[in-house]
Amino acid sequence: MVDIKPEQTQEGNNNDHLVQSDDPEHPANLIPELCRKFYSLGWVTGTGGGTSIRRGEHIFIAPSGVQKELIKPNEIFVLSYPTPKYPPSARKYIRKPSALNPSACTPLFLAAFDRGAGCCIHTHSQWAVMVTLLVEREKGKSGCFEISNIEQIKGIPRGKGKGMLGFFDTLKIPIIENTAFEEDLTESLEKAMEEYPDTYAVLVRRHGIYVWGDTPAKAKTQCESLDYLFQLAVQMHAHSLPWVVNESA
């Protein structure tokens, strides 16, 4: 048996052992499974979107520009963490599949991991896009998405170590403007994280959303809860129903 040296990259054996496991919860197996589920929900259509998981000192990332529902474990990129966001050439890839491109979402995923996340999901959900447009029309570009008095809000954390939001709480999700290139979103994403320190998601106008969680399971369920709320909000707006209930009215 050939000894595998972790420090080797694509010039050597490419550290294939990092993505080889029979454990369904291993990031190299879980990312393709999650992407298949997200594709079925219309979140990663046409190669859009992405998913990344941090496990210890390794970050596992789906490749860019591929059909997300067809991703295989051996197509997963692996980064050593911590690693620089910029320039891309400084990032510490310890596994790079041949003929595939690293995710353009990488620096945004890293921003979530720098906040302690264990998983970050990026989707192109139509409902997420729609609420960014409705907020812009109603509140202007500086407005954030807000909704209250909906049971599903309980699926969203109140903040790190603060438990979950309650039925009567108002969920607030910041919105940033889209850019021509994905990586150029990083600065405004990090600014939104600073302005909304308790948020676990950032919407991108006319683009989609980034959602992160302490674990892959939490990131997934939070993403599902948010998409439910976005869809409901669009339908509520169509019926002239307010998103935030004014209890004093």
UniProtKB/Swiss-Prot annotation:
It is found in: Cytoplasm. One of its GO terms (biological process) is L-methionine salvage from methylthioadenosine. The active site is at residue 151. Zn(2+) binds at residues 122, 124, 207. Substrate binds at residue 105. Binds 1 zinc ion per subunit. It is an enzyme of class 4 (lyase). One of its GO terms (molecular function) is zinc ion binding. Catalyzes the dehydration of methylthioribulose-1-phosphate (MTRu-1-P) into 2,3-diketo-5-methylthiopentyl-1-phosphate (DK-MTP-1-P). Belongs to the aldolase class II family. MtnB subfamily. This is Methylthioribulose-1-phosphate dehydratase. It comes from Arthroderma otae (strain ATCC MYA-4605 / CBS 113480) (Microsporum canis).
